[in-house]
Every structure is written in structure tokens, then in C-alpha cells.
Amino acid sequence: MSKLKKTLIILFVTMGLASCDVLNQVAQMANLVNCTFDFNSVNQIQMLGINLSKGMTKTDLNATQLLSLADAIMRKQLPVSFNVNVDVKNPNSIAAAMTKMDYILTLNGKQVVSTTMNNGINVPANSSSVVSIPITTDLFQLFSGESADAIVNLAFKLAGASSNPVNVGLKVKPYISINGQQLAYPDFISMNKVLN
């Protein structure tokens, strides 16, 4: 076999494999469109580095924690972190994958964060996966017009401590990479959960 023939065969095989890869990525995008996204929960809530367990209130804080909270109120800084968990259900017979996801989170209608999670996510065929979205914010900066008591109570409401509910809104837009190009889901997917 001539060198030219070998080169052409290698070229055609390589192109064929590349186009198969592109077709596979297109199929994954189609599968992603068929997936459903549902708000699952909020967990791993921390305020000033204090773990807020379910139903915890200010009266559950020890003396050291109360001093830290008083200092934070004086400085008007209340860092809070938590995870928003989303159920992604894949009804397809093959896996659905995303390379990254834009998201917008609101608390009681106020935008907390608008950013991108760059972790790749793979949802196996005919199954569900829970995607945890880490959130970090400062409640004093976010709710600057509110009283200190209302702002502190909001952190505890996230942990389910109050009869007054907190409305958590989430919009997500997943992406998939096709032939090196990032393609976005057609629109943001909106979810909402009232925590009480």
C-alpha cells in the first residue's frame, strides 16, 4: 500500500471518529433537553462558620457564638454559606452530560448571586443525580435596608427555624461542549421553594 493511501485511510478514519464524537455530543445535548430539573433542598447552612442544624434558633447558640454574632452585627457583616440541591432526572436511555451551568439565586425576591458552576455533571441513563450548588453571600450587604434582627433571622429561616417562610428562587442554564464550542440550554430553567 502506498504512503498516500495509508495517509488517506488514516485521515478518513480520524475524520470519522471525530464526527462520531460530535454526533455523540449532539446526542448528549438532546438528552439534556429532555432532563427535568427540580428544587430538592437547602443544606450545610453556615453563619459565621457556625453550622446551623435544622430548626436551630438564636437561643441554641452558646456564649462564644453569641459574641461572634454580636460582633458581626456591629460590623454589619454576616457571611452565610449553604448548598442548594437540585434533582436532575434523565429519562433517556443514554447518559446526559453538561460541562458547566449558569445559575441565579434569589432569597425573598432579592438576587443573591449570578455566576457559573464550572464542574462537569454526568447523569446516567434512566436515573437521577443531585447537583449541589454552593452559595456564599453576606446577608447584611444583600439586605442592607432591613433591621439587624430580620437579617439574622433570615439565616435561621434557611435552616427551617421560623414559621415565617423564606422564598428561595433558582434559575439554571446548563451547557454542553460540542466540538470545542459551549452550547447553552435554550432558556433558564426556573425553580422555586418556600422553606418554612
Tell where the protein language model's regions lie, with residue ranges.
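Bacterial N-terminal signal peptides that target proteins for export
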Residues: 1-8
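C-terminal motif of bacterial Sec signal peptides marking the signal peptidase cleavage site
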Residues: 16-19
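Bacterial signal peptide processing site
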Residues: 21-24
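Post-signal-peptide N-terminal segment of Sec-exported extracytoplasmic proteins
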Residues: 40-77
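Short, solvent-exposed loop/turn segments enriched in Ser/Thr/Gly
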Residues: 79-84, 169-171
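Asparagine-centered strand-capping/turn motif at beta-strand->loop junctions
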Residues: 88-95
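Intrinsically disordered, low-complexity Pro/Gly/Ser/Thr-rich segments with frequent PxxP/GP/PP motifs
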Residues: 107-109, 113-149
